[in-house]
């Protein structure tokens, strides 16, 4: 922690307009900066304050955006703060979320919701109380346009896939030996800190939560776990597989997701923040017509509320007869534009998450990603950790509410 002292109160931006939601950020790191960048470009949301345990970090980020800076325990004293965005290391998420909810503040929490299921349950119960503020978790894949397109194709034609498999060959260049990522007491471990993204996405596309999880882990000689393999069995025999390895330079990174619908379709998403989708569909005349109708307007097909298209998005269809009347092989390609880079797409997905929370606050409805979603993906991740430790398949905990 920096030795920089806190001023009595570091005053930055003026009061937001009456109808704007003032946003206070806890966590002045890289992800916190992404949240501020996304929030300041969202009409009706106004960043007002930055909090961090390190005064120097808080003041530096606050100064960059013209905001107030304060210690975390004083953020809720600011009457301008209506929404608390939490971007600290994971071990602080549950405590900060509970404090914000109990203080009547809405919460936008970076994943995971907690590192322990007991703490996640406390948050779940607080969020379920009558009149409770709204809470959502930053599951950016749910707000990615290619996942939105897949969801629409499933509803119109394909139904849930039979299998979901994610492969993450990731860089460790920014994860030095002392980084909190490697400390399971702080990060929760790979499946909790990072894997919940994909456990949630897999359950969302498969339309069910896993019934059984099995997993393996590999550690370096110094004890740091850098590789995790997990498999999940879903109701009806659907399967999901998750592989994470944080063990290579950035130039060798590679991530992809494979989807399979058995005899009817198969597909692949490229990038952990997906940039491209390829989908092969075997269909008949009505199925072809459904895909063509869905993709005629690509902006509608890829639409995510709060996500601003760049103009580089494209959807193309290639068609071939299967040699039988009315039977077709269809290849769909969709791209968000590789030149855009995953940074912009990630930031727009965060913006869409904030927009969804904003809409839920205005309507009184629940956001698209709820505390229950965050709880169940954490339960699956913890089941994977237990399975790796015991060598036995584990049933995830059941949602208590």
Language-model segments: which ranges?
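Beta-loop-alpha module in the N-terminal Rossmann-like domain of NAD(P)-dependent dehydrogenases
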Residues: 35, 67-126
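Glycine-centered short loops/turns at secondary-structure junctions
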Residues: 104, 131-132, 237, 391
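Hydrophobic residues in well-ordered beta-strands that form the structural core
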Residues: 109, 115, 135-137, 242, ...
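A contiguous active-site-proximal alpha/beta segment in oxidoreductase catalytic domains
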Residues: 114-175
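Rossmann-like dinucleotide-binding domain that binds NAD(P)(H)
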Residues: 177-253, 271-273, 372-375
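NAD(P)-dinucleotide binding in Rossmann-like oxidoreductases
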Residues: 220-223, 240-352
């Amino acid at each position: 922690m920096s030795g920089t002292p806190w001023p009595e109160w570091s005053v930055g931006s003026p009061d937001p307009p009456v109808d704007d939601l003032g946003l206070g950020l806890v966590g002045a790191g890289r992800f916190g900066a992404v949240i501020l960048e996304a929030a300041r470009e969202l009409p009706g949301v106004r960043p007002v304050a930055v909090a961090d345990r390190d005064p120097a970090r808080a003041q530096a980020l606050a100064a960059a955006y013209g905001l107030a800076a304060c210690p975390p325990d004083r953020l809720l004293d600011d009457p301008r703060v209506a929404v608390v965005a939490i971007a600290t290391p994971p071990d602080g998420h549950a405590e900060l979320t509970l404090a914000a909810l109990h203080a009547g503040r809405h919460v936008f929490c970076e994943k995971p919701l907690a590192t322990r299921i007991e703490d996640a349950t406390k948050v779940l119960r607080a969020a379920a109380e009558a009149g409770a503020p709204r809470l959502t978790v930053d599951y950016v894949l749910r707000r990615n346009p290619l996942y939105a397109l897949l969801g629409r194709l499933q509803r119109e034609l394909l139904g849930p896939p039979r299998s979901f498999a994610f492969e993450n060959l990731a860089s460790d260049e920014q994860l030095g030996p002392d980084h909190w990522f490697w400390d399971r007491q702080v990060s929760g471990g790979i499946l909790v800190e990072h894997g919940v993204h994909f456990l949630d996405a897999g359950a969302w596309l498969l339309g069910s939560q896993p019934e059984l999880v099995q997993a393996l882990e590999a550690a370096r000689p110094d004890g740091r776990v850098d590789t995790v393999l997990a498999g999940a069995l879903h109701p009806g025999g659907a399967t999901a597989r998750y592989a994470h390895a944080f063990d290579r330079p950035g130039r060798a990174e590679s991530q992809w997701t494979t989807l399979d619908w058995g005899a009817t379709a198969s597909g692949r998403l490229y990038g952990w923040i997906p940039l491209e989708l390829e989908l092969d569909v075997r269909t008949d005349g009505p199925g072809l017509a459904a895909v063509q109708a869905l993709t005629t307007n690509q902006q509608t097909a890829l639409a995510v509320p709060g996500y601003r298209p760049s103009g580089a998005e494209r959807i193309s269809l290639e068609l071939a007869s299967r040699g039988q009347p009315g039977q077709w092989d269809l290849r769909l390609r969709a791209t968000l534009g590789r030149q855009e880079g995953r940074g912009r797409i990630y930031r727009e997905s965060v913006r869409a998450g904030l927009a969804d929370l904003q809409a839920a606050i205005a309507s009184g409805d629940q956001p698209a990603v709820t505390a229950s979603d965050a709880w169940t993906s954490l339960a699956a991740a913890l089941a994977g950790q237990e399975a790796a430790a015991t060598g036995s398949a584990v049933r995830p905990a059941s949602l208590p509410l």
